[in-house]
């Protein structure tokens, strides 16, 4: 909408993230988006996935360039927050974590369902959920129904220091995103933020996670709609503490997402 209102002879550049262009080809909103974007000099997509999505929706491929989002240098961990995390988690291990809104696309539900079987192998496993959103009550209800109250911890409205400490002290960042209606994970900056602390990720194939995760090297890309695949992927990452090797690789890999590197593009 804002691009439509910009009346100028100056060059216009537009950033696209995924879900805002994910509408049926030929629909009124699709035609409107194509018209607006045709008037821009360049379209910056946040991932290869978003670029391909744009092209499939009829947007001029010659105008689209991929520049991934960047991150700032990782914040130094606060000793007080680290101490609080150790007190909260105690002997709980392995530790899974998601930092995101609680909505269908983020797929917390499937992780919780996989946890039911994982706890048979790893009785001290814990899943840390940080965020808020419309699915919060449903997720808490599911946790109760599956008798996982001891395995799932919910946090919201917490400080950045505590959030970062929880990430740093976790073993695997989990967000096997799916497409929900028109909502799609265009990139997934959370994977990069976790990797800065040496935490590998489980991401979903439906979206731009593959730009942020090297499958089999810095994490695993799976089918977020397939519960068995989520379970087996997590089991693989946990067995023999494979997440340690993946985490080391992830920390090296994401150095290219530092803003001082991204800005060169």
Short names for language-model regions:
Residues 214-216, 220-227, 236-241:
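Conserved acidic donor-binding segment of nucleotide-sugar-dependent glycosyltransferases
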């Amino acid at each position: 909408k804002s691009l439509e209102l910009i009346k100028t002879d100056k060059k216009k550049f537009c950033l696209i993230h995924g879900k805002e262009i994910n509408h049926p080809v030929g629909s009124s909103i699709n035609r409107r988006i194509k018209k607006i974007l045709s008037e821009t000099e360049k379209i910056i997509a946040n991932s290869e996935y978003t670029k391909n999505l744009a092209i499939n929706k009829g947007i001029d491929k010659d105008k689209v360039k991929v520049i991934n989002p960047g991150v700032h240098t990782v914040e130094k961990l606060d000793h007080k927050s680290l101490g609080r995390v150790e007190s909260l988690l105690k002997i709980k291990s392995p530790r899974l974590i998601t930092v995101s809104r609680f909505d269908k696309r983020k797929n917390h539900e499937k992780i919780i369902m996989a946890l039911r079987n994982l706890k048979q192998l790893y009785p001290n496993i814990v899943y840390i959920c940080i965020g808020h959103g419309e699915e919060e009550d449903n997720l808490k209800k599911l946790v109760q129904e599956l008798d996982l109250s001891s395995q799932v911890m919910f946090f919201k409205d917490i400080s950045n220091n505590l959030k970062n400490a929880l990430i740093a002290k976790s073993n695997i960042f989990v967000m096997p995103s799916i497409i929900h209606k028109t909502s799609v994970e265009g990139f997934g900056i959370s994977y990069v933020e976790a990797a800065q602390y040496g935490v590998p990720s489980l991401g979903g194939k439906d979206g731009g996670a593959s730009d942020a995760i090297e499958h089999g090297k810095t994490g695993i890309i799976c089918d977020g709609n397939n519960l068995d695949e989520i379970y087996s992927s997590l089991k693989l990452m946990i067995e023999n503490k494979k997440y340690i090797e993946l985490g080391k690789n992830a920390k090296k890999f994401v150095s290219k997402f530092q803003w001082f590197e991204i800005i060169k593009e």
